[in-house]
Amino acid sequence: MHRIPGPIRVVLTGGIACGKTVVSDDFRALGTEVVDTDIISRELSKPGSPMLEAIAKALGAGALSEDGSLNRRAVREMAFHDKGKLGILNAITHPAIMEEAMRQAFAARGHYVIMAVPLYFEGGAGGYADRVLVADCAPEVQLARLMARDGSSEATARAMIASQASRDTRLAGADDIIDTGSLSFDEIRTAVLNLHQKYQTL
């Protein structure tokens, strides 16, 4: 397969509450451009947008908050409990989000660009990554972080984790790994700096 042109694309992914934001923020601090699909998703689903209208039509009025914005918690609950709705949601959002992500990646000026794609493996691990960086942590650390962050019960947190690709799948598909569970913030920063220097030579 021919490589898609443009800067080197490093996909940053990882399980929920595994420290992807900390890692991406450290890359940003080094001047690296970061294309974040979560941010793109929020931009594309603003009130009045075609994507938001399509989501509301497919999932019903419960997908919207009183102010007309996307009710992310409600949509997450719908998708979590109904695989059919999850498939519909992904069919509406994924192509548009990835089209914009690739547009931003092509426009990046550095030697490499970080593409933060939380559900990279769940989305079929499309052939746009030159390298895959996984933010990882031990399952017990992930569970504790998720419960603390979202105020979730243990059962809900475990179910959310189980709905994603397995840790083994992510690690098997990784070219590089940063263990955010065992490293301090300073050590994570150092690990990012080392990878930054490595990626500059690819």
Residues of each region from the PLM?
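Glycine-rich phosphate-binding loop of ATP-dependent small-molecule kinases
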Residues: 1-70, 190-193, 197-202
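Amphipathic alpha-helical segments that mediate coupling or scaffolding at interfaces
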Residues: 15, 58, 78, 92, ...
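Residue-level signal for inorganic ion chemistry
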Residues: 19, 38, 89, 114, ...
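Switch II (G3) loop of P-loop NTPases
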Residues: 112-119
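Charged, compositionally biased, marginally structured helical/coil segments
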Residues: 122-124
